[in-house]
Amino acid sequence: LVADSRNVALNHTAGLSTPQQVQMVLFALFNLMDSRQSYKKAVKSVVRERDAALYRQLGVEVPQDPNAVDYYTLVNLENTSRKLYGDAFADWVMKNKNPTELLFRVADETGVVLLPGSGFGVQHPSARASLANLNEFQYAAIGTSLRKFAEEAYLEYKKASKKNK
């Protein structure tokens, strides 16, 4: 039995909750039968490899959060800028870069649309990527695009810093 959770959720919002209830029962029964949790471990491994591919290309360590469910990863450009080039650069990014610029940039370069990291309508340079839907190479491409964005911003920052001296 294969069913895409998004289709199940769509059916649920259309008022057809019985299919969702049946699917959840099947998931629960499968989990009880898989006493070694091998399926869950395999899925977690795939998701974590995707996350690692993104951050490896970005050039920073994968954030460690013991409470994370790892379904999404949140890339905060302010924190990433700080890790890559220091506090002064991160402050400059917050004052001078359009918060949505990185979302459009990644979409243009990779064909992948990321969601705003801090919620819709919040002006903060961050992005949220689902780790459930793409192939590992696509997450690496996202990381590469974000790193390129940071490098270009750093060159702008250095140029602006020289002018101000």
Please give the residue ranges for each predicted region.
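PLP-dependent class I/II
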Residues: 1-165
